[in-house]
């Protein structure tokens, strides 16, 4: 700051603060008596060891002092607890005794004792010997509270006056410049008027300068109010914390949840044809994750907003968006929605709210108009936005045609349009689909390039209507554009993504799919083949079907297609057609160049159908195969281009090779089919893989490679046909072969290939028996018609080949799984959360699990659950953590690309399927979650030292007694099993299970852990013994028993499992018993241990006979059973959970922010144990629920962990999907679909079935909160509890408020109400009344359940729809009756009367809201609070608002409505300054910068206009005025920027410019003393007294309520302001000067500081300084400008340390003392050394007074004799020096920084111009001017009248002519001429002379044509052409000398 500001800061007692190294904060008010000797000896030694404390000097800062800091300086606390420091009494001394008065301006308690170590009582203490010791133990008088210390303390001890209302600081208000004015951006007179209470400020006035916008419509507009409209959000929004702590006067949460959305201006852009932004389709289908935006905006961090592309659509949007093309929209349903949506939004005049979609496709595509949902689940989510997108899609072509309309539209189209249609849309749109059962997450995705015309879409919509499959359709018209686009598309995605990631395969659950599929196939293929445009038509390969049926159906379709195409049509499709051409172009330009793996993709597709291929090559089918091939060959030319290229592989099925039986009779007999692939491809990964595995096979069979030459054909695919047992030598051979096959088909390259592998041909024969031969034209169609729907499923199930009915995707799943398939009826179909990767596994496992993390994790579990369980220890045999070698795991790609087996930057998912070996004919596949078969070993390069991180997926499976397990193991260890008849099994089961079922005894859970990496089990020996087999079967049975245990607890589970368990016992292929005895014992065993029979008949009747089931429901009361079962609630194992979170924070996430939970969600859907799953690739952390069973209830919870990083805004964790209830719902849906209601999909309604008992949730959440509160900061208002899609919101504040105990009076109970006749709605809500009702379906006789939320939120059911049941009733009364009617007797308390202690009636207390009253003078602490309050109060009604029947005032404390002092004067300015916190200042900074950038353009425009309007005076005047104002604005903005940035740099806040605590100067600095028997007092005491008097007066006014708002009060406040002003600077305002009795103005603080005798100049600046000297200055004319002469004596003294250093360095002396002696003795040597030192060392010269910055300049010293400093005469004017005895001071800069600054900044030759005026300051004067004049004078005699003695001889000679200058100087040195002799010299350069403009005196013309012009000073000779060739000039030697000197200077 400039010196003036420095004075001001000092005057505010913002004393110099220096932070010293040892973290002691030290202020300059510290007493001189109190130095730093107080510290310990060590610290003291440290201090004195350092040579100098320059670093500490650098740390000194000058700040504004806060009121708290002033208070801290002034106050001192006594041992008895009393605090002194505040001056309350205006009196000074007693008039008689002259002793200080208590609490007054000289009080000894505040300022210290008058005499050393003597108190007011007169008691003296002995003075200490050492003054320092006294500060260690302070002593006080117990009577008068005065400290025993030195009286010097009165010179340093401050006091303070506490002002009633804040007062502005005079210098910051009225100073020049006025800081307060420029920071607030208001006019000075306005702010002064406010400060001096001459104007009253209303809300509007306070509002206007800060807010340019009208009243806010949304809270988000409040949050973003200060940002500039066109700039991006993520630069400007800083973290705004809006929690309920900000709202002390009202509680927003009680009526409704407040939601915040981010608004962002939508830019208007035209369509750019060339921009093809290819979106990432990896997560295309994954359900976009959303969250409720409660009242915490901590997700608005800038780094997160990069991904949060939420659009804000202007209200103007509606004017543009008239939907002019709605007649073109095919779907009436969409029209309705659009209309209703637009109507509602138009009526309310509100903006649409944007919902953030985090799936990548929506992040990147710019067409986003989503509603902002209050509460939503995954079912309702898509409905709104898809219809909007479809509407856009239908309008697209028109928009492109009408170029004009582009500019008007305010939204952006992306180049691709995604249409996601979920089940509701499909259902409502298409009546044909009403019989279908659509899975929960079915979506149709169509990706269409922009070139699709509307007509084409119309034609295509017919197929669209019946479409139940998924299509990827891409068009190619403009070749270059599209190839470029397609290229980028394929480059960015792997094969697998291209073919599969667009598609959700859930629809395959639908039984009718097979019927419709073939029709669609034929339709589409024909259509696409006929179209002129080339279309790629890719059909997703249904993994669940194992592609068998699908493949056959395709073949039949193509055969039909070939037959149906006539020859004429084939001619159309000949090689000249558009299609074939484009196909060629496409293949050339795209696949060959850019997608080298295309052929591999073809091979992969072929591999997908390997079973079909196997079937093909069996002996029965060879003839058919030949027929097909011949047919294809006939049509080869015509159809080559259009058929999918993988069918070409069939054409090239050429060779079958057999190994010669004679050469290897004892060995394997098998066939190999070789398929030639496209020869264009140079390299095939798959072929190489096959070669490697074939080598292994050959090695196993001991076959020489020569015998199988035919197999080694390049570009070949290898297919196993048959393996027979006859010729095998070894028992374990088949398992070895299976391993190889599994490896072959379990590659990472082929993630969708099933791991199961069927070797025998029996199954195919079974298929033939079941009429599964589809090779003829219509076989498949006839078969599928005959066995439509579930019959087909049954057939396939019975064949034990595949099962695709059970639980492909559960209803409750939010995540979509890409790969879902089933291997056996007994297995659950695995639901994959991530891509499953298969890896090769070597036999030996060593050293993978050395990590502490796993040990820690494992030991917790082991110690807790495995201690007493011997069987478990048997299972976990040899699990040594150091036995596993990481080198034995690797991906297949590494096999070829790296010779070494290294793990680098790959996630490893280790699949159990590798290890499962069975003697049975089928292989069970291990899955990700079920049966704990899956271990995830995660490896990532982002961790330190590239270590392997292991997090195990452990599933705890409950089972029973130890002997029970032993029996199972014995039973399973038997080697062979025989099949048994399914009917007999059923009979046995029923017979045995009906007995003794009630006598079952269930013990508590035990827990088993299955780890897959067993070190010793996996070896050839164990495989031979068959122990691995037993392990796997045991695994299955344990899981089976888990079911029985769970089934007892939860009936839901039973439904889902029973069918599969029955199948397990009935199926032939799965278990084969060796003997009937074993069979019987097993059945008995099962009978004893289960209560299976209890529900068997029930379930059968439930499934097969719906009518009977209805009666059974009433008799057996299943629903009651269900409802009686309470929710089992798991909770976290505290230790493990803490450790887990800590581990994750330490090792895994660098960005992981502790204590950041956006939202806590509890999910009660699963009754499951732990799965911890981390996908570090996407940085998503999944923490599943909880880890063990307690004796109390279970609670399964999940939290939204907020991990801030670039890719995701928050964490979303959901674990709905393990052994979830989804399968139960699946069965029920099948039943209900067929029996109850064909017109509605029940997946939405069924989840409402829930417990009839209430759940006491408070203690559970309390427990959860206590567990997590140390790790997590709960920022959200509510906790979301999810019960099967119905959501309860729980207010977290109840817990936070009462951390110690839960309030018993207001415990929350949640009653789940059931109703027999209720409207269920599929709906969604939008905040601002944009409500669209999608469907209302009525259900009768179905027990549906609605969740009611007590007092804090919205309902799941729309109450205005419930009201429609009885329209006549008043809504509240009806609803109360409705609830009362259905309340059961279980409730001990009235559940909903949670409001008051003194309850109102039970009926009246369901919905309530608090009444909070605000004082009419209530002032908001910040602008944003007022905005939010207004936003909340003024928000319009929405259909989802609930009527609040009554209000309850709940403010009991009188303190809340206490009268606050009114705000006036400085208080208002304080309020305004308080709003300028750091985030706000940053925003202002950005805003000012943006304005500044525009100003130059504005000025340029004005300049241009000024030039154009030179003639028009009016305009000229107007624009010049405008220019002046713009320049003024620029100056004021720059000034404001400077202050704001300065405030940002220092720790001071703007509000510190307002005084709340006025410091009182120490008593000795304003003394009262006697002079000649009279008392003389300092003027300051009078001024302080005035302040105290006026402060007390204002206090009295404010205490009295009658005067607290009066004009008297305002006047008193003004008087206080003036008193403080006069104290700081008396006389600033002429009207309010304080004077003494003589009328002389009193001296204020300002006068003490300023002036020559002021505190700074006299006391601080006028001190002696080290390394300085002083001497008289003398002129040094021979010096250069940057040099000065320094006397040698002075130089030796100044540079003494440097000299000594040099002496010691050169070893002239050994010690410092001897060096000093050396200096005295050896003077000559020392001067030499000194000259070396001085060369590189500048010095600073200063002449007092230093009035401007040129008063100190740096020079290079030159050593001179004498005692005076030599100074260059030109420098004198800068110093204002002359040589009449002036003195100057010399200073030596010591540090390197000071020297650098001396050289660069203050060197004299760098200061040639005056900094004030810019004029040159080094002007010659006196002697220099005289010398110049003397040199250049022409006539010496004209100098004076007095005649000099002149050499007459020289003077009279006037005819000297010289040819050059050298001869002139030679003549001058010989004394032939003097300086003033007139001479002539030949000089051909240009000259200046008076006679140039005159006429020549004569012209001489020669006969040769040359001529001479003669002037008085020179003459010129010209040639014939008139060019000068010679010039002779008359001058003097002095002038020549001067000219040469000037030239030398310039050159």
Swiss-Prot record:
InterPro entries named among the record's database cross-references: DNA-dir_RpoC_beta_prime, RNA_pol_asu, RNA_pol_N, RNA_pol_Rpb1_1, RNA_pol_Rpb1_3, RNA_pol_Rpb1_3_sf, RNA_pol_Rpb1_clamp_domain, RNApol_RpoC1
Positions bound to Mg(2+): 1778, 1780, 1782
Coiled-coil stretches noted in the UniProt entry, renumbered to this chain: none
GO annotation terms (biological process): DNA-templated transcription
Pfam families tied to this protein: RNA_pol_Rpb1_1, RNA_pol_Rpb1_2, RNA_pol_Rpb1_3
Leader sequence residues: none
Cofactors that this protein relies on: Mg(2+); Zn(2+)
Location in the cell: Plastid, Chloroplast
Gene3D superfamilies per record: 1.10.40.90, 2.40.40.20, RNA polymerase II, clamp domain (4.10.860.120), RNA polymerase Rpb1, domain 3 (1.10.274.100)
MF terms (GO), sorted A to Z: DNA binding; DNA-directed RNA polymerase activity; magnesium ion binding; zinc ion binding
A GO cellular component annotation in the UniProt record: mitochondrion
Disulfide links within the chain: none
Family: Belongs to the RNA polymerase beta' chain family. RpoC1 subfamily.
Protein name: DNA-directed RNA polymerase subunit beta'
Gene designation: rpoC1
């Amino acid at each position: 700051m400039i010196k003036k500001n420095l004075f001001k800061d000092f005057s505010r007692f913002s004393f110099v603060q220096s932070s010293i190294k040892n973290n002691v904060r030290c202020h300059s008010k510290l007493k001189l008596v109190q130095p730093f000797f107080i510290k310990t000896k060590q610290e003291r030694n440290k201090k004195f060891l350092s040579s100098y404390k320059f670093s500490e000097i650098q740390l000194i800062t000058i700040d504004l002092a806060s009121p708290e800091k002033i208070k801290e300086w002034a106050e001192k606390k006594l041992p008895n607890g009393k605090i002194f420091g505040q001056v309350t009494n205006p009196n000074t001394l007693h008039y008689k005794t002259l002793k200080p008065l208590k609490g007054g301006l000289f009080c000894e308690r505040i300022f210290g004792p008058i005499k050393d170590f003597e108190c007011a009582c007169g008691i003296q203490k002995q003075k200490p010997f050492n003054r320092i010791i006294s500060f260690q133990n302070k002593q006080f008088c117990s009577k008068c509270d005065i400290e025993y210390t030195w009286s010097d303390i009165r010179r340093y001890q401050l006091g303070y006056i506490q002002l009633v209302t804040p007062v502005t600081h005079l210098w910051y208000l009225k100073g020049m410049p006025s800081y307060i004015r420029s920071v607030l951006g208001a006019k000075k007179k306005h702010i002064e008027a406010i400060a001096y209470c001459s104007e009253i400020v209303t809300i509007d006035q306070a509002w206007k300068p800060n807010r340019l916008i009208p009243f806010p419509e949304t809270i988000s507009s409040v949050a973003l109010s200060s940002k500039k409209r066109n700039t991006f959000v993520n630069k400007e929004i800083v973290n705004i914390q809006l929690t309920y702590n900000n709202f002390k006067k009202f509680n927003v949460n009680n009526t409704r949840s407040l939601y915040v959305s981010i608004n962002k201006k939508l830019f208007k852009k035209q369509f750019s044809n060339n921009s093809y932004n290819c979106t990432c389709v990896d997560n295309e289908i994954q359900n976009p994750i959303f969250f409720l935006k409660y009242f915490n905006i901590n997700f608005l961090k800038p780094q997160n907003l990069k991904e949060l592309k939420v659009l804000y659509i202007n209200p103007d949007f509606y004017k543009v968006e008239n939907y002019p093309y709605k007649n073109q929209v095919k779907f009436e349903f969409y029209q309705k929605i659009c209309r209703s949506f637009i109507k509602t939004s138009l009526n309310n005049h509100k903006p649409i709210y944007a919902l953030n979609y985090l799936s990548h496709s929506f992040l990147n595509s710019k067409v986003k108009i989503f509603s902002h949902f209050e509460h939503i689940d995954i079912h309702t989510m898509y409905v709104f936005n898809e219809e909007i997108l479809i509407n856009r899609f239908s309008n697209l072509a028109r928009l492109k045609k009408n170029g004009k309309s582009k500019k008007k539209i305010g939204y952006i189209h992306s180049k691709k349009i995604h249409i996601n249609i979920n089940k509701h849309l499909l259902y409502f749109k298409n009546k044909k689909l009403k019989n279908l059962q659509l899975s929960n997450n079915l979506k149709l995705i169509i990706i269409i390039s922009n070139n699709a015309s509307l007509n084409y879409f119309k034609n295509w919509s017919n197929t669209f209507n019946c479409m139940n499959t998924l299509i990827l359709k891409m068009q190619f018209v403009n070749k270059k554009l599209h190839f470029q686009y397609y290229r980028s598309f394929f480059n960015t995605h792997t094969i697998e993504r291209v073919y599969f990631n667009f598609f959700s395969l859930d629809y395959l659950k639908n039984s009718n799919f097979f019927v419709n599929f073939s029709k669609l196939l034929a339709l589409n293929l024909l259509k696409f083949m006929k179209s002129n445009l080339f279309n790629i038509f890719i059909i997703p390969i249904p993994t669940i079907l194992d592609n068998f049926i699908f493949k056959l159906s395709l073949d039949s379709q193509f055969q039909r297609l070939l037959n149906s195409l006539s020859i004429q049509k084939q001619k159309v499709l000949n090689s000249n057609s558009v299609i074939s051409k484009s196909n060629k172009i496409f293949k050339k330009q795209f696949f060959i160049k850019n997608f080298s793996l295309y052929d591999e993709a073809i091979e992969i597709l072929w591999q997908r159908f390997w079973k079909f291929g196997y079937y093909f090559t069996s002996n029965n089918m060879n003839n058919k195969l030949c027929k097909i091939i011949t047919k294809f060959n006939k049509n080869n030319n015509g159809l080559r281009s259009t058929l999918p290229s993988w069918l070409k592989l069939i054409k090239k099925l050429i060779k079958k090779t057999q190994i010669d039986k004679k050469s290897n009779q004892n060995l394997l007999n098998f066939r190999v089919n070789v398929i030639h692939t496209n020869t264009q491809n140079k390299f095939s990964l798959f072929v190489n893989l096959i070669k490697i595995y074939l080598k292994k096979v050959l090695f196993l069979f001991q076959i020489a490679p020569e015998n199988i030459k035919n197999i080694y054909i390049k570009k070949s695919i290898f297919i196993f046909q048959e393996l027979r047992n006859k010729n095998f030598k070894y028992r374990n051979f088949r398992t070895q072969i299976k391993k190889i096959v599994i490896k072959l088909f379990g590659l990472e390259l082929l993630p969708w290939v099933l791991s199961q592998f069927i070797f025998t041909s029996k199954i195919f024969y079974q298929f033939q028996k079941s009429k599964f031969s589809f090779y003829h034209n219509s076989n498949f169609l006839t078969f599928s018609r005959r066995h439509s729907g579930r019959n087909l499923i049954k057939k396939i199930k019975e064949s034990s080949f595949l099962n695709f009915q059970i639980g492909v995707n559960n209803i409750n799943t939010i995540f979509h799984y890409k790969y879902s398939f089933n291997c056996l009826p007994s297995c659950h179909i695995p639901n994959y959360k991530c891509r499953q990767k298969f890896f090769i596994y070597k036999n030996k496992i060593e050293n993978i699990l050395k990590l502490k993390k796993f040990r820690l994790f494992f030991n917790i579990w082991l110690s807790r659950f495995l201690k007493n369980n011997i069987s478990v220890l048997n299972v976990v045999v040899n699990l040594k953590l150091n036995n596993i070698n990481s080198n034995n795991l690797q991906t297949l790609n590494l096999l070829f690309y790296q010779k070494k087996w290294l793990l680098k930057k790959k996630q490893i998912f280790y699949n159990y399927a590798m290890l499962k070996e069975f003697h049975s004919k089928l292989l069970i596949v291990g899955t990700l979650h079920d049966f704990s078969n899956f271990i995830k070993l995660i490896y990532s390069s982002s961790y330190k030292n590239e270590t392997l991180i292991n997090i195990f997926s452990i599933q705890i499976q409950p089972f029973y007694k130890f002997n029970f397990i032993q029996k199972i193991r014995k039973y399973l260890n038997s080697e062979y099993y025989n099949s048994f008849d399914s009917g007999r099994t059923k009979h046995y089961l029923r017979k045995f299970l009906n007995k003794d079922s009630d006598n079952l005894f269930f013990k508590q859970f035990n827990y088993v852990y299955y780890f897959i990496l067993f070190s010793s089990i996996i070896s050839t020996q164990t495989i031979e013994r068959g122990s691995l087999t037993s392990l796997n079967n045991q695994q299955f049975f344990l899981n089976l028993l888990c079911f029985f245990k769970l089934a007892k607890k939860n009936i839901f589970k039973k439904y889902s499992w029973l069918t599969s368990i029955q199948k397990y016992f009935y199926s032939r292929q799965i278990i084969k018993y060796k003997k009937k005895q074993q069979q019987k014992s097993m059945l008995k065993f099962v009978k004893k241990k289960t209560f299976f029979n209890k529900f068997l008949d029930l379930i059968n009747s439930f499934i097969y006979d719906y009518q009977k089931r209805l009666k059974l429901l009433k008799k057996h009361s299943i629903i009651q059973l269900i409802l009686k079962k309470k929710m089992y609630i798991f909770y976290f194992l505290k230790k493990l959970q803490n450790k887990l979170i800590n581990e994750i924070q330490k090792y895994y996430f660098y960005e992981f922010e502790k204590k950041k939970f956006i939202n806590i969600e509890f999910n009660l859907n699963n009754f499951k144990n732990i799965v911890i799953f981390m996908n570090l690739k996407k940085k998503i952390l999944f923490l599943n629920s909880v880890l063990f069973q307690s004796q109390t209830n279970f609670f399964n919870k999940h939290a939204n962990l907020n991990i801030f990083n670039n890719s995701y805004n928050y964490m979303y964790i959901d674990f709905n999907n393990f052994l979830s209830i989804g399968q139960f719902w699946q069965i029920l849906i099948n039943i209900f679909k067929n029996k109850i209601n064909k017109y509605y999909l029940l997946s939405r309604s069924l989840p409402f079935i829930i417990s009839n008992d209430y759940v006491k949730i408070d203690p559970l959440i309390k427990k959860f909160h206590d567990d997590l509160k140390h790790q997590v900061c709960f920022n959200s208002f509510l906790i979301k509890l999810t019960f099967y899609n119905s959501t309860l919101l729980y207010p977290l504040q109840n817990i936070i408020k009462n951390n110690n105990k839960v309030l018993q009076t207001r415990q929350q109970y949640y009653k789940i109400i059931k109703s027999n006749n209720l409207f269920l709605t599929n709906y969604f809500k939008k905040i601002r009344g944009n409500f669209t009702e999608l469907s209302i379906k009525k259900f009768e006789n179905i027990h549906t359940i609605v969740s009611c939320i007590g007092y804090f939120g919205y309902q799941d059911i729309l109450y205005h729809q419930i009201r429609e049941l009885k329209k006549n009733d008043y809504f509240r009364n009806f609803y109360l009756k409705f609830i009362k009617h259905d309340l059961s007797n279980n409730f001990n308390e009235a559940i909903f009367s949670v409001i008051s202690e003194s309850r109102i009636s039970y009926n009246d207390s369901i919905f309530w809201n608090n009444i909070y009253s605000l004082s009419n003078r209530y002032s908001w602490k910040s602008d944003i609070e007022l905005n939010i309050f207004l936003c909340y109060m003024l928000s319009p009604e929405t259909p989802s608002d609930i009527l609040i029947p009554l209000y309850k005032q709940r403010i009991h404390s009188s303190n809340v409505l206490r009268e606050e002092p009114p705000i006036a004067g400085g208080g208002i300015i304080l309020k305004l300054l308080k709003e300028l916190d750091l985030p706000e200042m940053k925003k202002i900074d950005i805003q000012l910068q943006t304005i500044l950038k525009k100003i130059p353009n504005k000025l340029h425009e004005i300049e241009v206009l000024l030039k154009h309007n030179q003639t028009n005076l009016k305009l000229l005047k107007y624009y010049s005025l405008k220019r002046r104002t713009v320049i003024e604005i620029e100056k004021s903005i720059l000034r404001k920027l400077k202050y704001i940035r300065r405030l940002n740099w220092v720790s001071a806040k703007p509000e510190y410019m307002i005084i709340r605590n006025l410091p009182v100067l120490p008593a000795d600095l304003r003394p009262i003393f006697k002079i000649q028997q009279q008392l003389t007092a300092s003027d300051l005491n009078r001024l302080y007294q005035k302040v105290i008097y006026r402060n007390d007066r204002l206090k009295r006014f404010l205490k009295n309520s009658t005067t607290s708002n009066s004009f008297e009060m305002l006047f008193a406040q003004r008087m206080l302001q003036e008193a403080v002003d006069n104290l700081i600077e008396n006389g600033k305002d002429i009207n309010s000067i304080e004077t003494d009795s003589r009328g002389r103005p009193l001296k204020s603080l300002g006068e003490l500081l300023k002036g020559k005798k002021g505190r700074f100049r006299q006391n601080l600046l006028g001190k002696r300084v080290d390394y300085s000297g002083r001497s008289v200055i003398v002129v040094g004319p021979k010096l250069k400008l940057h040099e000065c002469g320094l006397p040698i004596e002075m130089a030796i003294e100044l540079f003494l340390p440097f000299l000594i250093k040099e002496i010691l360095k050169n070893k002239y002396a050994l010690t410092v003392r001897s060096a000093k002696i050396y200096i005295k003795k050896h003077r000559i040597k020392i001067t030499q050394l000194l000259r070396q030192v001085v060369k590189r060392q500048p010095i600073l010269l200063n002449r007092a007074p230093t009035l401007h910055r040129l008063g100190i300049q740096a020079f290079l010293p030159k050593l001179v004799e004498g005692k005076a400093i030599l100074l260059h005469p030109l420098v004198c004017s800068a110093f204002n020096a002359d040589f009449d005895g002036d003195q100057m001071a010399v200073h030596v800069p010591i540090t390197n920084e000071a020297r650098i600054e001396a050289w660069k900044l203050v060197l004299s030759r760098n200061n040639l111009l005056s900094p004030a005026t810019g004029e040159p300051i080094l002007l010659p004067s006196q002697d220099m001017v005289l010398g110049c004049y003397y040199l250049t004078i022409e006539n010496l005699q004209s100098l004076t009248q007095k005649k000099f003695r002149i050499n007459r001889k020289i003077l009279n000679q006037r005819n000297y002519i010289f040819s050059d200058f050298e001869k002139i100087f030679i003549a001058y040195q010989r004394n032939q001429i003097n300086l003033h002799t007139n001479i002539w010299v030949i000089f051909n350069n240009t000259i200046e002379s008076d006679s140039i403009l005159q006429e020549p005196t004569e012209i001489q013309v020669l006969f040769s044509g040359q001529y001479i012009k003669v002037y008085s000073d020179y003459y010129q000779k010209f040639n014939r052409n008139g060019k000068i060739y010679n010039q002779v000039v008359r001058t003097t030697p002095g002038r020549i000398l001067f000219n040469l000197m000037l030239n030398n200077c310039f050159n």
